[in-house]
């Protein structure tokens, strides 16, 4: 089900506030031109409640689920299986994210029905992959449709490799991926703060002028100013 005027409603599921903020900033940026409407929750259980998968006959309110893999209580993989099992008539596209590029984890999710697997942090080049997995786009991956092992797009270098490849590339550092996400948030904040720099500079000059005037008045009252002028 596609939102009005071509807007894809995305349910973002991630227990990390930083990672949620990164995705929200990216999908709400001018580059996306209003293509996405993001609804964020911090757990898989809240996602289940929002989707109404526990209530028979309740209509879906979103077009796509973008979920983290590692979460407490209920993982993204378990959420993926629940969505695919409980909504067979109206399948919801599910994209899994993880800060670890592990081929076994990717293969596990793809075999469970995930439309894609993206390594964190989400980047602008990944937006097109989300568009391809939109219900209105028929180009989304159809894993195993030809009876062959699914081809996985490893998000670290965006090179298509076979899931059975023997020599996978080394996984990126989870800490490095987290820092990259923090850096994206800080960059966005710095852009917003840059508009206030001229006002801050004028305020500092005004304070400095007031301090100088106060010092002159203090010297005048003590007679120091006249002595300095006569000398």
Swiss-Prot record:
PTM note says: Two-component system major event consists of a His-to-Asp phosphorelay between a sensor histidine kinase (HK) and a response regulator (RR). In plants, the His-to-Asp phosphorelay involves an additional intermediate named Histidine-containing phosphotransfer protein (HPt). This multistep phosphorelay consists of a His-Asp-His-Asp sequential transfer of a phosphate group between first a His and an Asp of the HK protein, followed by the transfer to a conserved His of the HPt protein and finally the transfer to an Asp in the receiver domain of the RR protein.
Q: Tell me, what is an example of a GO biological process annotation in this record?
A: adventitious root development
Q: Mind telling me which InterPro entries this protein's record contains?
A: ARR-like, CheY-like_superfamily, Sig_transdc_resp-reg_receiver
Q: Which residues form the Response regulatory domain?
A: 9-135
Q: Which residues carry this modification: 4-aspartylphosphate?
A: 68
The alphabetized UniProt keywords are: Cytokinin signaling pathway, Phosphoprotein, Transcription, Transcription regulation, Two-component regulatory system
The organs and tissues expressing this protein are described as:
Expressed in mature leaves and flowers, and at low levels in roots and shoots.
UniProt-listed Pfam families:
Response_reg
Q: Does the keyword Manganese apply?
A: no
Q: What triggers or suppresses the expression of this protein?
A: By cytokinin.
- SMART domains, alphabetically? REC
What's this protein's function?
Answer: Functions as a response regulator involved in His-to-Asp phosphorelay signal transduction system. Phosphorylation of the Asp residue in the receiver domain activates the ability of the protein to promote the transcription of target genes. Type-A response regulators seem to act as negative regulators of the cytokinin signaling.
Q: Which family does it belong to?
A: Belongs to the ARR family. Type-A subfamily.
Q: What is this protein called?
A: Two-component response regulator ORR1
Native species of this protein? Oryza sativa subsp. indica (Rice)
The UniProt gene name for this protein comes to RR1
